[in-house]
């Protein structure tokens, strides 16, 4: 069973969201998602400074099996991307909740967090998919 850290929020499309304070959030894909995708070969990240709306496809994770869109779980401005993934996309596989993070958003509307899943809700979603 995949790890589902309790301190994170989750989107139904398998992104995780961690608050960094000051309305800033780090986004990545869950361990479950990277297991389904398999070994990452390339991650196409959004441009720093670009605006995204909730649900926008803003990044792509390419693995040996498939290419998968990654959706913005919050509206806001992209304030950072994980440059390490440029040469080491496998970090998404080896450390999805740590060094394999994808991008950071300065949230426009933090009430959107209310629509995200907690760890128990995400666990239920994953179990219902299997």
UniProtKB/Swiss-Prot annotation:
Cofactor(s) recorded for this entry are:
(R)-lipoate
Q: Is Lipoprotein a UniProt keyword of this protein?
A: no
Top-level taxon of origin: Bacteria
Checking Pfam families in the record gives:
GCV_H
CDD domains in UniProt: GCS_H
Any one of the GO BP annotations:
glycine decarboxylation via glycine cleavage system
Specify whether Chloroplast is a keyword of the entry.
no
Q: Which UniProt keywords apply?
A: Lipoyl
Residue ranges of the Lipoyl-binding domain?
A: 24-106
The record ties this protein, via Gene3D superfamilies, to: 2.40.50.100
Bilayer-crossing residues are none
**Residue list for modification N6-lipoyllysine:** 65
**Which cellular component terms (GO) are annotated to the entry?**
cytosol; glycine cleavage complex
The note on cofactor binding and number reads: Binds 1 lipoyl cofactor covalently.
Q: How does it assemble?
A: The glycine cleavage system is composed of four proteins: P, T, L and H.
Question: HAMAP family annotated for this entry?
Answer: GcvH
Query: Which protein family is it in?
Result: Belongs to the GcvH family.
The protein's role, per its UniProt record: The glycine cleavage system catalyzes the degradation of glycine. The H protein shuttles the methylamine group of glycine from the P protein to the T protein.
The name on file for this protein is Glycine cleavage system H protein
Q: Which organism is it from?
A: Proteus mirabilis (strain HI4320)
């Amino acid at each position: 069973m995949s790890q589902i850290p309790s301190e994170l929020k989750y989107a139904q499309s398998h992104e995780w969201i961690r608050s960094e304070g000051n309305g800033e959030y780090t986004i990545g894909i869950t361990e479950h998602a990277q297991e389904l995708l398999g070994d990452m070969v390339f991650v196409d990240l959004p441009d720093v400074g670009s605006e995204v709306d909730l649900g926008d496809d803003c990044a792509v994770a390419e693995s040996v099996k498939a290419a998968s869109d990654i959706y913005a779980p919050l509206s806001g401005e992209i304030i950072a991307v994980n440059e390490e993934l440029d040469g080491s996309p496998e970090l998404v596989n080896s450390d999805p909740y740590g060094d394999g993070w994808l991008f950071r958003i300065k949230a426009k509307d933090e009430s959107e967090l209310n629509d995200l899943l907690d760890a128990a809700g995400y666990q239920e979603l994953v179990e219902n998919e299997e």
